[in-house]
Each structure stands twice: as C-alpha cells, then as structure tokens.
C-alpha cells in the first residue's frame, strides 16, 4: 500500500476518507454491524482475501454474530451462483434463437 500512497497520495487520502465516512458508527441509517456484514458479502463476491478477513472481524467487533457472518457469506455465494445461472440462460437463449 505504501507504493500506491507514495505514487498517488491525494487519491489514497480521498479513498480512506470515503471509507472512514462509510464505516463511521455515528453516521448512516444502517447500524455498523449491518454495514460490515454487507461488506463481508461484497468482499466474498469480489474475492478480496484482505477485505473478507478485515470486514468479518469488524462485523463481529460491531456486534454481529458468527452466524450472521456465515449468513452474509451464504447470501453472497447464492448471488454469485445466481449470476452464473443467468449467464447460462443467456447461452441457452442464444442457441435457441438460432433454431
């Protein structure tokens, strides 16, 4: 991260400012644990190992249970699998149209 910060300090600063605002426990409609659970699900979908570990720990620290983290993971997995199925439907449609 130091290399990125050195090469683009303003952008890195803006990114961390944005991240801090999103995960500020004193702002927003969603409580912090819910925001962290959403982050876990997104991290699983984007397959970011650092983000998965960081947000899972932060979710528990914010009050989420291990069961809630597991559920967020499974929701993300279902949506990711659903994307594969819908792409499969497109494949089937593309060959059906040519019949």
Positions of the model-derived regions?
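Acidic, glycine/proline-rich low-complexity segments that act as flexible tails and inter-domain linkers
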Residues: 1-36, 87-99
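Iron-sulfur (Fe-S) cluster-binding segments and ferredoxin-like electron-carrier domains
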Residues: 12-14, 53-68, 92-95
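Alpha-helix N-cap/helix-initiation sites
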Residues: 31-32, 49, 66
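Short, thiol/selenol-centered motifs that function as redox-active sites or metal-ligating centers
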Residues: 38, 42-54
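C-terminal structural segments of small proteins and small subunits
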Residues: 70-94
């Amino acid at each position: 991260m130091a290399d990125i910060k050195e090469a683009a300090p303003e952008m890195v600063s803006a990114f961390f400012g944005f991240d801090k605002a999103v995960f500020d426990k004193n702002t927003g409609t969603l409580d912090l644990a819910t925001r962290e659970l959403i982050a876990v699900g997104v991290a699983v979908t984007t397959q970011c190992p650092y983000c998965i570990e960081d947000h899972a720990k932060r979710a528990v620290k914010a009050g989420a249970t291990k069961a809630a983290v597991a559920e967020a993971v499974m929701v993300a997995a279902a949506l990711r699998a659903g994307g594969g199925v819908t792409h499969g439907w497109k494949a089937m449609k593309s060959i059906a149209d040519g019949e």
